[in-house]
Amino acid sequence: MTQQTPPEEVARIFDAEVRDAELRDPDTGGFQPSWNVAPTDPLTVVLQREDGRTVERPRWGLIPSWAKSAREGARAINARAETVASSPAFRVAFAKRRCIVPADGFYEWQQTGGTRKQPFFLGPIGEHVVLAMAGLWSVWKDPVTGLWVTSAAVITTDANSDVRVVHDRMPVLLPREWWAAWLDPDERDQDLLRSMLTAAPDGILDIHPVSTRVNDVRNDGPDLTAPVDPAADRVAAPTSRSRAKATGATPDTGQGTLFD
């Protein structure tokens, strides 16, 4: 997905606070915009604490409280709407630790024959619009370091007609009128919560093919969301990214299946 909106602007949109001083100061590196957020990366979320709504940066990939290691969260980047209320990994978070993942857009991959997949960028139609993805969060204590780790996942559902042309799943996108109930940890009406986990209406997303450079998490930058002619697309070298290395194998981060 892409997250370029600064935490302070996210706080304004969602009537929340940025309490972490590093997130308020771009010079500290606490928040860096990304056009290629990958699993285990920091992820901007909005969640409800006991004393108010906050903007935080957990890692993407929910680590259940009972997990023995952080590795168990590396692939738990998505929770399926159909099973989230009963899944051992997600049911506790669904009951009382729901969050919103504000995104400026996301990627889906279309199977084009054989093993090739064509990436598409899906972004909101209109300027200054942030997508409110339904998410879950959790806290886990690392048994080795003793440190508490906050992590999060995105909930997915069957795709609407527009998105289905590319992929059969998509993130749940919450309309503004559902934000308060979704974030409220005291809201325990399972039927109400499950009723929110439906596909967004057609006509709200701009969808276009983008370069296969997005398949490599070492690549980052606004050019990744630019429309391309798939027939003319050629993979280029990685652009600057803090975790990029001049040599070495590309890690398996699940790119190509992010929102299953």
Language-model features: locations:
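Short linear sequence motif anchored by a di-proline
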Residues: M1-D260
